Structures are given as C-alpha cells and as structure tokens.
Curated annotation (Swiss-Prot):
Residues 259-384 form the CoV N CTD domain. The lineage of its organism: Viruses, Riboviria, Orthornavirae, Pisuviricota, Pisoniviricetes. ADP-ribosylated. The ADP-ribosylation is retained in the virion during infection. The gene is N. Residues 9-22 have a biased composition (Low complexity). Residues 266-385 are annotated as: Dimerization. Homooligomer. Both monomeric and oligomeric forms interact with RNA. Interacts with protein M. Interacts with NSP3; this interaction serves to tether the genome to the newly translated replicase-transcriptase complex at a very early stage of infection. The keyword RNA-binding applies. One of its GO terms (cellular component) is host cell endoplasmic reticulum-Golgi intermediate compartment. Keywords: ADP-ribosylation, Host Golgi apparatus, Phosphoprotein, Ribonucleoprotein, RNA-binding, Transcription, Transcription regulation, Viral nucleoprotein, Virion. It is found in: Virion; Host endoplasmic reticulum-Golgi intermediate compartment; Host Golgi apparatus. The modification Phosphoserine is found at S167, S191, S391, S424. Belongs to the betacoronavirus nucleocapsid protein family. This is Nucleoprotein. SUPFAM superfamilies: Coronavirus RNA-binding domain, Nucleocapsid protein dimerization domain.
Amino acid sequence: MSFTPGKQSSSRASSGNRSGNGILKWADQSDQSRNVQTRGRRVQSKQTATSQQPSGGTVVPYYSWFSGITQFQKGKEFEFAEGQGVPIAPGVPSTEAKGYWYRHNRRSFKTADGNQRQLLPRWYFYYLGTGPHAKDQYGTDIDGVFWVASNQADINTPADIVDRDPSSDEAIPTRFPPGTVLPQGYYIEGSGRSAPNSRSTSRAPNRAPSAGSRSRANSGNRTSTPGVTPDMADQIASLVLAKLGKDATKPQQVTKQTAKEVRQKILNKPRQKRSPNKQCTVQQCFGKRGPNQNFGGGEMLKLGTSDPQFPILAELAPTAGAFFFGSRLELAKVQNLSGNPDEPQKDVYELRYNGAIRFDSTLSGFETIMKVLNQNLNAYQHQEDGMMNISPKPQRQRGQKNGQVENDNVSVAAPKSRVQQNKSRELTAEDISLLKKMDEPYTEDTSEI
C-alpha cells in the first residue's frame, strides 16, 4: 500500500507531535553535546554554500512534497542531528520517514552596478527511492545530498510514497517534530526569517507559571503552520506602497499631466538612452520612419517597448561589450544645428557603427522573432503605398453646405427623396385604366342597400 502525504490522518504522527519536551529549536539554542552517531553508515559530507555549482542555476527535476529550506547566511552548513530532519506529513507513518535533502543551486542575477550575484541554494526533501537520486542507496556520499531518517525507519528499503502530481497536490509547508534543531543560517520557505520570534515562542512555555499554560502554549504552537497565506503578496505590496506614500486601494491613473511629465523626462535623456513607450512614442523619441530608421510599424510605433512583442526582440539586442568590440566604429564631427545662436557653440560628434546580429533556427522563439521582424522591417514603405492607393477625401469649400456638389459653377441640391428624384418611366396598363376612369363623368349611385 502506497502512502500519500497529507491524504490520511496519522494517529502515530499526531501522538508524536504531542509527545516530547519542547517545540522546534534553532541551532543557536542547541547544546554543544549533540548526538551525532552514524548508526553504522558513513559520515555525511558537510554541505556548504561553497559547494554549489558556480555556473548559473540548475533546474529541480522532480516535485518535492514539501516547501524548501533556503540558505540566507553564507558559510553555514546544512545538517541535522541523528534521527532528525524528516518533515511531518499526515498519512505517512514513522516507518516511512526516510529520505534525503537535495540542494538546488539557484541561478545568478545582475545587480544594479552590473555585477553578477549568485543566489544562495535552496534544499528540497525527497523520500527514499524518489526524486533525482531515487536509485541511490541511503548514505551514499553525494555532493548536494544530505540523508535523513527517523529512528523507526528501515533505511535498507525504499519508502512506499507516491510521487507528487503538482496539478492535483500542493506542496505541504515544511514542519518538523518537537525538538528538531534547524540548521543555523537557513529558513523554511513560507515562514519568513523570523528566527527571533520563533525562539521567543519556544521559550514561552518554559517561562509559563503553570503546566496548564504550557499546555495551552504548546497547543497553539502545534496548530500554527508556517504556510504562505494567499494574501501575503497583497500585504507586501500594500506595505511597499505605504512606504512610498501611495494608497493601495486607489488605482493609479495616468493623467495628461503625468503623461506629459513622463514624455519630457524621456526626451531630456540623450538619444541613445531613450526608451519609447505609451507616453512617448517611437516617432517622438527618434523621429519618423525612413531609410535610416526603418524599423517599426503599426502598434509597435504607438507602444514602443511596451508592445507585448518587444521583449522577445530585446533578446537579440547586443550587450555593451558586443556593441563596442563586435562592431565597426567611426567617429565623425557633425554640424551643431541646435541651440541658441547667441550661446557658445558646442562641438558635436557622432559615433557611427556597423555590425550584425547573427542567429539561427535553433534560437528559442525563432518563428515568433521572424514574424515580428517581417512585420516591422521597412514597414514605413507599406504604409506609404497604402496611403497612395487610397483616394483623398474631397475637401468641402468654405461656405458650401453638406450634400451639395459643384458642376460648371452651378450648385445643384442633392435629392432628398425618391419623389424629388422625378425619374421618368413608361405608363403601365393599370395606369392607363386609372386615367380613363378619371376622364369619365361622375354618376351618383342611387341603389338602396
């Protein structure tokens, strides 16, 4: 019989939660003399932040049943004491509480100063016989893997746990039995980095004056879970808006004044630093389209970088290094046509460049990129052709009323009805019969009814 975490109530797990002499502890509260026996298996290598892959992040290949544990302090080791480290899951007996923590190396990101910063790793728990190391035996020395098991579990057989289907089963917030010591410098996803608050609640039962208060405090700590609430993102957004002095309940409207300010702010930047958007269009930033500026048409000229198709084009844009070192550059002095003639004239230079961006059909989104490029390259030519094919609307002369046309300087009023059109047609037999009756003399009908 396979077990599904969170699907059944486990009396053994519940009784285990009620037993014990305390709740979850933190590493800075633990005693120096901890039981770190190995039960006959090899000592696990300590997993540190320095052992993560230096080149970017890796993809978690399998779905864990529990939320992750994230490192927030460098140089801290991820480890649990003997018999600890297996999360609590309703429906899973203690005999199946065995598995390993898998280190997920997250990708790096670029900071404001242009440097690459590597995110600290995040650890996910998988039951023995599941996950990325399903075929490995318990205790195998693997970089980025830390084996854990309860004292009642048989580590020689895989755990009888089904794999999680993310479409039907949500991840369970990670919780541990009472007395578990978390690795220092780590926090459970969804619980925040509130270690001081957790330590204060852990000490609260010890400071309580009676056993009853300790029981009530422990009961409250048992029922609370560090899961992510649905409105947590809204609360964070409200706090950020409050710091900025804005009301989160009122929608931010872009008025003509704010749009004008945004447009002026963009136009005050140098030409090569402008980013056109809804408030400042492409033509306002860079002028009309032509042979020297031949990209853009339709909605992209109106929306600029706000166009939904623009981000995929931005993937083709060269970096600053590729621009300077991968292009042919030429410095030329040009005539200064701007400025007040009374002011001192400035020397104006142009850094002209000539290069190419090479890509092939293996590029992600290749078909979409080709479609967008074909729609916007030299689009101004098609627009001009379309304008030439459309006959211009005749302009109405001043003082001329609608519905009048001029022919040889004679104004003829437009007909207002079919009767006024006065179209000639031949008389039918019915018409002739009616005319004859009209010519006959009138005779009064004297017949009685």
